[in-house]
Regions:
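Active-site-adjacent substrate-recognition loops and nearby beta-strands
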Residues: 295-313, 319-337, 349-360, 401-407
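Secretory targeting and sorting signals
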Residues: 2-77
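Active-site core segment of subtilase-fold serine proteases
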Residues: 108-226
């Protein structure tokens, strides 16, 4: 990994881009658009004008993760059956590795057990200390911030999430009205994502509160343990209900209209472009000042490039790295839309039925960044989505080639420095504007001429 000089507290203007896409029933034209990269240099990139996603070019939307193994712990001494590995997904290039389940431990430790290290679940959350997140809880815990999790549904009864999950919405038409029911081929995914954002742990006999930390002493504690989760369920990877073309815009609009300040989308597609039906919803979120964080995608799931919604201008796209801060071969992908990278391997999270799951994927990296954004929103409540995005990218530790690159984006996220930056003097989202993109590109679509019968 090559490091370059870091630039802090200065406006960074991200690439203005559009996804490359060719559809059988459409043709596209290419227009040159000037984009500024950094505050002191400009670059001209030729940006492909993209046509609407054709009906014959199916977009597959799925969670971005690889389940490794069910963890042996549960709040009940008997692990829940729902914590078993999920079935193989349609887009998985190879079967997900089975991993090795960790040795089963008692849910009730002996009296006098250490109260400083927490239980085995908590100890596995290496990112909390290694990235300085625990030190930020004296300044912010996410209290008063609502984060929408647009995913497979969230189990609000899990002890590590109980009380932090609001009554949400089902955008699919086949789930529970409140968004609490797991749906699709990976029904546990949304619960895992939510726990990394706003898990608060739970009480277990023999453990007492950890000094200086919010929440309970055992189980998963999220980056923003006092934030509220607004669950919005989608049906992905299985048939039934509404189409993804309908589900996504409905989900985004519901999140915005029901108080979400940040939206997490740990889901991705096999296309860099997106249906035109999504445009207005993402523009609406932009206009209302809601920050959207999305996972980049995983090579291990057969994705070789970032796919929508992570390619949409203005979305803060998160790639994955391993514990050595190297881009993960299987748990990340590449693309010019990546903004920052965060841990995505050897993760542990809460799973429905009072269980836990060991997993990897950019699905796990995104909620860590979302959680930090929630801390920043509490600490700086008057800052806009553009300013929050600026904090996160300007404070990142440059990695890979100097400057922004398609593997690390602006670099490895740095929660402590993001919190410490002076208020960014930016008015526009440094990652682009979907509203501007629509104005430039959607109006210039040209249909393929119909061949003459003559």
């Amino acid at each position: 990994m090559v490091r370059s000089e870091r630039r802090r507290g200065m406006p960074l203007t991200g690439w203005s881009f559009a996804p490359s896409f060719a559809c059988a029933s459409r043709v596209s034209r290419v227009f040159g658009v000037r984009a500024s990269v950094g505050s002191d240099r400009g670059a001209t990139r030729r940006i492909p004008k993209v046509a609407a996603l054709g009906a014959n070019a199916a977009l597959t939307l799925l969670p971005l993760w690889t389940p490794l193994a069910p963890a042996a712990w549960a709040t009940d001494p008997t692990p829940s059956a729902s914590a078993s590995p999920s079935p193989k997904r349609e887009v998985t290039a190879t079967p997900s590795p089975s991993g090795t389940a960790v040795p089963k431990t008692s849910a009730t430790p002996s009296q006098g057990a250490s109260t400083t290290n927490g239980d085995d679940v908590r100890q596995r959350e290496y990112w909390l200390k290694e990235y300085g997140i625990t030190s930020l809880w004296s300044q912010a815990t996410g209290k008063g911030v609502t984060v929408a999790v647009i995913d497979t549904g969230v189990d609000g009864t899990h002890p590590d999430l109980e009380g932090n999950v609001l009554r949400g919405y089902d955008a699919s038409g086949v789930g529970s009205e409140d968004g609490w029911k797991g749906l699709g081929a990976e029904p546990m995914h949304g619960t895992e994502v939510a726990s990394l954002i706003a898990g608060h742990g739970h009480d277990t006999q023999g453990y007492s509160a950890i000094a200086g930390q919010p929440g309970k002493p055992t189980g998963v504690i999220g980056v923003a343990p006092e934030a509220k989760i607004l669950p919005i369920s989608l049906n992905m990877g299985t048939t039934g209900g509404k189409s993804i073309d309908e589900q996504i815009p409905a989900a985004v609009r519901y999140a915005v209209d029901n108080g979400a300040q940040i939206i997490n989308m740990s889901i991705g597609s096999n296309k860099t472009s997106w249906p035109q039906s999504w445009d207005e919803a993402f523009a609406y979120a932009e206009q209302k000042g809601v920050l959207i964080v999305a996972a980049a995608g995983n090579r291990g799931s057969g994705l070789t490039q970032v796919g929508a919604p992570a390619t949409i201008p203005g979305v803060l796209t998160v790639g994955g790295i391993d514990r050595n801060k190297q881009v993960s071969e299987g748990s990340s992908t590449q693309g010019i839309s990546i903004a920052v990278v965060a841990p995505s391997t050897d993760m542990i999270a809460a799973a429905p039925g009072n269980g836990y799951m060991l997993w990897s994927g950019s699905s796990a990296a995104a909620p860590l960044v979302t959680g930090v954004a929630a801390l920043l929103k509490q600490r700086y409540p008057k800052e806009s989505a553009a300013q929050l995005a600026q904090r996160l990218i300007a404070s990142a530790d440059d990695a890979g080639v100097a400057g922004r690159d398609p593997l690390y984006g602006y670099g490895v996220f740095n929660p402590q420095d993001a919190m410490a930056l002076a208020s960014p003097a930016v008015t526009a989202n440094p990652l682009g504007s979907i509203s501007e993109w629509i104005a430039v590109h959607r109006k210039q679509q040209v249909s393929e001429p119909t061949p003459s019968d003559a």
